[in-house]
Amino acid sequence: MNRRQLARWAGVASLVLAQGVSSLAFAADEAPDALITRLSTEVLDAIKADKSIQTGDVGKIIALVDGKIMPNVNFQRMTASAVGPAWRQATPEQKQKLQDEFKVLLVRTYSGALAQVSDQQIAVRPLRASPDDKEVVVRSEVRGRGDPVQLEYRMEKTPGQGAGWKIYNLNVMGIWLVETYRSQFAQEINAKGLDGLIAALAQRNKSNDKKSG
């Protein structure tokens, strides 16, 4: 698999993270593999039906993220894991800025790859887990032209009635998203601290915005 194909499926997987659901009650009743099956189908259908998304309309994708991300993703945990130990020393303001910039980075990084989605389908493998499990890995396979692409989602069962399952990491062909960014973020934190990381993310997002503008 080449970098372009990897980016394409990382983009699809990231949009699954951002897609969320329209009904929290429905999500709470769904098994994690059933949830991923439905979200994957909805995401692919949305991409195929929306010309703006296909052309990488970042504003529209960000609007989708803003409206749907919270129900199905523990984005605070995802960001905290990517930042690493330094997260514990971050102020509430720094934590919010890190989440905001990281979300924009993910959307802008993968929005261009979404235009390449065409006739693909996603098959989710049946989940083998105990009803008492609090964390699971849901495995899926993207099928279309060329070799199938493996996607995996790490999910947690959130406490409280009606909370359901939430995604906190994803794997595209053996590469976990959070771990990939953790190594990048660690270099910036070691050199310039948390504020330096925030500034670097903001600058990267501005540069990506100019390229897409």
Regions found by a protein language model. Name each.
Residues 30, 49-56, 60, 89-93, ...:
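Surface-exposed, polar/charged faces of alpha-helical domains
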